[in-house]
Regions:
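Helix-loop element at the rim of GNAT/NAT acetyltransferase active sites that forms part
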Residues: 10, 17-29, 155-165
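A short helix-loop-beta-strand connector motif used in the catalytic cores of GNAT acetyltransferases and
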Residues: 27, 32-51, 63, 95, ...
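Conserved beta-strand in the GNAT
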Residues: 42, 48-56, 61-68, 187-197, ...
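Conserved acetyl-CoA-binding loop-helix of GNAT-fold acetyltransferases
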Residues: 69, 75-88, 110, 212
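Acyl-donor binding region in acyl/amide transferases
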Residues: 73-76, 90-92, 201-212
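Conserved GNAT acetyl-CoA-binding A-motif
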Residues: 89-101
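Conserved active-site tyrosine of GNAT-family acetyltransferases
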Residues: 107-113
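Amide-forming acyltransferase catalytic core, primarily the GNAT-like/NAT-type
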Residues: 114-203
Length: 212
């Protein structure tokens, strides 16, 4: 019988192996971060981890991610049980969102989610010796993000609508050489970009700018 419960820290490497099978690129560090800043949920067949998801409580906004079920357990409502539990844990949020591939869109619609928009994943292959730390242009208004952390957090809350401060602070601290802000002529932060990753793989985001 499948039981849904909090993901055990001892099963983080198993969770990584699940996402590895799909080529999602989640590193061990990513899973350690997710365990720390999200509400990690596991589907267990006895002591065996067969599915995972992560729920993020950002105050008024909740986010569900990393929904994945081991191939031999698919088609048995395990994914539905995981998402249902994530929604239960985010019931204090006024809105819950989930990022989905086109192949999985029908699954979320059956649960009750509505399509809100579409996104596209972009990929950049580069010589990693040149790619880390990220090179920036010579404009003096592009500066490291660490000195402007409070401004970044206020701006993100305005634009995102929820409070992602712990997540963003963790990313800036973990990879400061890949975190930048754009300043206007009055040295006011107008945008920021952060990234996560290690070795030969990086994912850019959140990437937020003020309108205009």
């Amino acid at each position: 019988m499948i039981e849904i419960s909090k993901l055990l820290e001892s099963d983080l490497e198993t969770a990584k192996s699940l996402t590895d099978t799909e080529g999602w690129g989640n590193s061990s560090e990513d899973w350690n971060r997710l365990f720390k800043i999200s509400l990690p949920i596991g589907a267990y067949d006895g002591d065996k981890l067969v599915g995972v998801t992560t729920a993020f409580d950002y105050g008024s906004i909740g986010m569900i991610g990393n929904v994945l079920v081991s191939e031999e357990y698919r088609g048995k409502d395990v994914g539905t049980k995981l998402v249902t539990e994530a929604m239960r844990r985010l019931e204090s949020c006024s809105t819950v969102r989930v990022h989905s591939t086109m192949e999985s869109a029908s699954f979320y619609k059956k649960i009750g989610f509505m399509a809100e928009g579409m996104s596209t994943l972009f990929r950049l292959d580069a010589d990693m010796k040149e790619f880390q730390p990220f090179a920036i242009d010579s404009d003096d208004n592009i500066v490291p993000a660490g000195r402007h952390l409070d401004e970044i957090l206020r701006m993100d809350k305005r634009q995102f609508g929820g409070d992602r401060s712990e997540y963003i602070k963790d990313l800036v601290s973990y990879l400061p050489e890949c975190a930048f802000v754009a300043l206007d002529d009055n040295n006011i932060v107008k945008g920021f970009i952060v990234a996560k990753g290690e070795s030969n793989w990086y994912e850019v985001g959140p990437w937020v700018v003020e309108p205009g």
